[in-house]
């Protein structure tokens, strides 16, 4: 925590990654304690992500990381997993602040992913490459001459609100970076200009789209969008999300697989638990009893297939009878929150819903095992720390050297 960048957000230095697993946990503890020390780093992060070059100012969504410490120059590669967590945190932040700036970025990003990130199966693909025609960022950047020729006198609106210049900010070209909040009197003119630029950009050759639909990421995305639709009271988003859930259900009707396009890829813990999380969220939103039953079945299957009786935790790969060695224990939050913490969260929900003691018993097993390994993994286990607090409200969380008990 002492390495937080108090000006630009996330951690100090470059390259710079959003580290959503940490800031999601931090915002959870802010909502619980109202301690502004937890709120401020999240606000700084989201302000910077939404206004700088890492955010696609024309279409929405963020790139995987920035090469500089001020988020100006992105690596341009767009990943589904990052943006799921970006949408989730933006939703929570908007719900708390009611700041329309963040709502607009949230809606723009959702629209982008629903329009541009779906494959021919109408599921979400995995990523867009950083380069097109062999040049990194070519699809996204603008020369000053190009902007001047396209916009004529209207370029003044762009110059007033975005950091553009003849020298540019990326290899002689310009990445759109907001200067400040756009005045109400210029919003309409600027929106027209941005739409004009977007229409021109869409005529360019796009970066390569990796259209592989991964079960864990699709389930996670749909679960987040389902929650967002409820929080925003957006029936259209809810309806479209449920339509996509039905497509995913059909694909996984016979067997849970990691990648529909390549069934040879091994299935992982996260494929099971994120699908179970989606199903229980669908039950919470729509009182869909079949979804609840499916969630319970998936959770029981997960216990049978992935639970390691020696470590008393889940391993990433399915345990086979003829395995000579157990897979290494993986408790880190990497691209997405760890499957162990997701299982703990769902079992806590299932115990509240069903009052079946099997879920509280499994919770106790996981919590006990977690406490035995936390000192080795804590810096990468923020989703687990957050989930444990949801389950028992008994953790102590430290910020800038001062310990605050969470009851």
Residue ranges and their predicted role:
Residues 1-407:
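Glycan-recognition and catalytic cores of secretory/periplasmic carbohydrate-active enzymes
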């Amino acid at each position: 925590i002492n390495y937080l960048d108090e000006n630009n957000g996330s951690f100090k230095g470059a390259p710079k990654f959003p580290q959503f697993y940490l800031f999601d946990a931090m915002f959870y503890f802010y909502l619980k304690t109202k301690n502004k020390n937890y709120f401020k780093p999240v606000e700084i992060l989201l302000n910077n992500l939404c206004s700088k070059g890492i955010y696609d100012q024309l279409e929405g969504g963020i790139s995987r990381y920035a090469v500089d410490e001020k988020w100006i120059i992105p690596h341009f590669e767009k990943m589904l997993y990052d943006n799921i967590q970006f949408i989730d945190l933006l939703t929570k932040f908007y719900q708390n602040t009611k700041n329309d700036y963040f709502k607009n970025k949230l809606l723009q990003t959702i629209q982008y992913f629903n329009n541009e990130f779906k494959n021919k199966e109408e599921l979400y693909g995995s990523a867009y490459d950083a380069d097109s025609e062999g040049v990194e960022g070519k699809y996204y950047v603008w020369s000053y001459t190009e902007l001047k020729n396209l916009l004529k006198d209207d370029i003044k609106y762009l110059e007033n609100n975005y950091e553009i210049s003849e020298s540019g900010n990326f290899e002689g070209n310009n990445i759109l970076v907001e200067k400040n909040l756009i005045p109400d009197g210029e919003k309409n003119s600027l929106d027209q200009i941005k739409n004009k630029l977007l229409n021109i950009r869409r005529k360019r050759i796009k970066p390569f789209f990796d259209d592989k639909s991964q079960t864990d990421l699709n389930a996670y995305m749909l679960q987040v969008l389902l929650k967002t639709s409820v929080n925003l009271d957006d029936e259209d988003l809810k309806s479209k999300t449920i339509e996509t859930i039905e497509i995913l259900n059909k694909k996984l009707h016979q067997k849970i697989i990691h990648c529909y396009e390549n069934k040879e890829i091994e299935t992982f813990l996260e494929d099971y638990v994120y699908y179970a999380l989606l199903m229980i969220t669908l039950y919470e939103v729509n009182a869909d009893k079949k979804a609840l039953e499916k969630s319970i079945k998936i959770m029981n299957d997960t216990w049978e297939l992935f639970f390691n009786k020696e470590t008393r935790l889940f391993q990433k790969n399915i345990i086979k009878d003829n395995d000579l060695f157990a897979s290494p224990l993986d408790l880190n939050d990497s691209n997405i929150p760890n499957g162990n913490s997701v299982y703990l969260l769902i079992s806590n929900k299932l115990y509240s819903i069903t009052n079946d003691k099997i879920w509280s018993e499994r919770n106790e097993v996981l919590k006990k095992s977690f406490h035995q390994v936390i000192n080795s993994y804590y810096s990468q286990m923020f989703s687990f720390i957050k989930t444990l607090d949801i389950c028992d409200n008994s953790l102590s969380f430290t910020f800038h050297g001062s310990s605050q008990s969470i009851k």
